[in-house]
């Protein structure tokens, strides 16, 4: 059996931990650049707000109902996510952090000694007590069914936070009630194909013969079908393995000069390299893209992208940044006011075991790897970007995103530590 532990309205829940006076009140978290709503509490949904709403279009509702508005703070959310995962590991041996707000738990063997529902309720209560983050839990023989169970646990209070799908009767009832478009692994194209063949519920899909599924769908579709029938076959570590990593931003202000673009692209490249090291992976291709503001018809429009291949997979910040800046120089055009840029690293491979290349222009890779370790250690201890490349520039720059409502980094920055007696 598997359990899927899903943090409820995670971004908003984290903000409420540090602003307890917001309990029971509408709260929303905005996307980068404070553009649109990416997370909201049930109270915010009740007054007519929706995920994806541009904030300027719902300003009257936000102000009229005194909605608490926060800018996204991924450093704070990631730190709290790590705490939730660590708490899970105090009770369950095999825990896989699938996303920032979801973790899979392998419960194999626990059913012989515990009532799984009561056990997971105790785990959920511990998470709530230690972090104040509410969670919903789904338990089932496959990960897809466990994700489905967590949705039911979140939607229906009668489950008291934990929904277990452990019999064929429960499985079929869940498949009948669940929305096919919400099934993990069923994207838009697959949904359209299934609908074309008269399949409108997960139960319709699960009841199809194996031969039909194999003849009409690709391997992921077959895996989803097996999972819906209670047969676990999805290796989430494979699903999670990134094929590309992208860091991009819409600028807070339009940028025209090359130096500012270099600073932005260097920051994005550095972020990609940091993510690669976190996955113990390296990339062999670096892509940079630029675009003007398509909503400003009075300005000249331009967009372009180009790539550079590397000799060997790397996660070295300096190497990736240098490659990105070379690409930027090729696609930059003077006289354009740029609104967005980004860096993509691809052709990602595990860094270990490392295979040296005879023609590698960097001959001191072991020493460079130690330098990157030192860079990461300093930034982990003293705060992100404490140590950075000179080309990345100062912390405050015009191109950086708007984040007028961002909370301090209470858990990762000594300057953001909350003082006892602070008013909320």
Regions found by a protein language model. Give the residues of each.
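Gly/Gly-Pro- and Ser/Thr-rich, intrinsically disordered tail segments characteristic of DNA damage-repair
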Residues: 1-226, 236, 365-424
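Short, charged/polar surface micro-motifs in flexible loops or helix N-caps
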Residues: 10, 33-36, 293-296, 348-352
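Short Gly/Ser/Thr- and Asp/Glu-enriched loop/turn motifs at secondary-structure junctions
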Residues: 98-102, 140-143, 281-285, 336-340
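Short, hydrophobic beta-strand segments
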Residues: 103-109, 305-311, 355-360
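A general secondary-structure junction signal
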Residues: 139-143, 290-292, 342-347, 391-393
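DNA-contacting surface of Y-family translesion DNA polymerases
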Residues: 182, 190-337, 353, 424
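C-terminal hydrophobic structural anchor segments
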Residues: 319, 325-381
């Amino acid at each position: 059996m598997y359990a899927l532990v899903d943090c409820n309205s995670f971004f908003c829940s984290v903000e409420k931990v540090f602003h307890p006076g917001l309990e029971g009140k509408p709260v929303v978290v905005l996307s980068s650049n404070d553009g649109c709503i990416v997370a909201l509490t049930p109270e915010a949904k009740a007054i007519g707000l929706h995920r994806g709403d541009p904030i300027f279009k719902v300003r009257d509702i936000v102000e009229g109902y005194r909605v608490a508005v926060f800018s996204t703070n991924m450093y704070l959310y990631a730190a709290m996510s790590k705490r939730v995962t660590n708490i899970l590991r105090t009770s369950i041996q095999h825990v896989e952090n699938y996303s920032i707000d979801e973790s899979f738990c392998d419960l194999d063997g626990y059913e012989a000694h515990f009532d799984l529902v009561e056990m997971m309720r105790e785990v959920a209560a511990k998470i709530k007590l230690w972090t104040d983050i509410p969670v919903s839990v789904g338990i089932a023989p496959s990960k897809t069914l466990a994700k489905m169970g967590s949705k039911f646990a979140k939607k229906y209070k009668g489950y008291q936070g934990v929904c277990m799908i452990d019999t064929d009767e429960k499985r079929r009832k869940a498949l009948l009630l669940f929305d096919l478009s919400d099934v993990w692994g069923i994207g838009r194209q697959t949904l359209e194909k299934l609908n074309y063949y008269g399949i409108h519920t997960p139960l319709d899909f699960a009841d199809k013969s194996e031969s039909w599924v194999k003849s009409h769908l690709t391997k992921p579709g077959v895996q989803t079908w097996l999972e819906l029938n209670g047969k676990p076959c999805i290796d989430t570590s494979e699903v999670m393995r990134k094929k590309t990593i992208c860091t991009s931003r819409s600028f807070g202000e339009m940028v025209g000069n090359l130096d500012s673009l270099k600073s932005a692209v260097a920051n994005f490249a550095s972020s990609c390299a940091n993510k690669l090291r976190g996955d113990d992976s390296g990339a062999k291709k670096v892509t940079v893209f630029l675009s003007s503001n398509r909503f400003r018809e009075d300005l000249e429009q331009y967009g372009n992208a180009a790539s550079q291949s590397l000799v060997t997979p790397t996660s070295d910040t300096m190497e990736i940044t240098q490659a990105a800046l070379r690409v930027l120089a090729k696609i930059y055009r003077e006289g354009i006011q740029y609104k967005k840029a980004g860096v993509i690293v691809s052709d990602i491979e595990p860094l270990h075991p490392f295979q040296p290349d005879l023609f590698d222009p960097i001959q001191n890779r072991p020493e460079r790897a130690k330098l990157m370790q030192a860079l990461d250690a300093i930034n982990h201890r003293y705060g992100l970007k404490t140590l950075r490349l000179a080309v990345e520039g100062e912390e405050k720059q015009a191109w950086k995103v708007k984040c007028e409502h961002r909370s301090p980094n209470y858990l990762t920055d000594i300057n953001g530590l909350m003082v006892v007696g602070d008013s909320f």
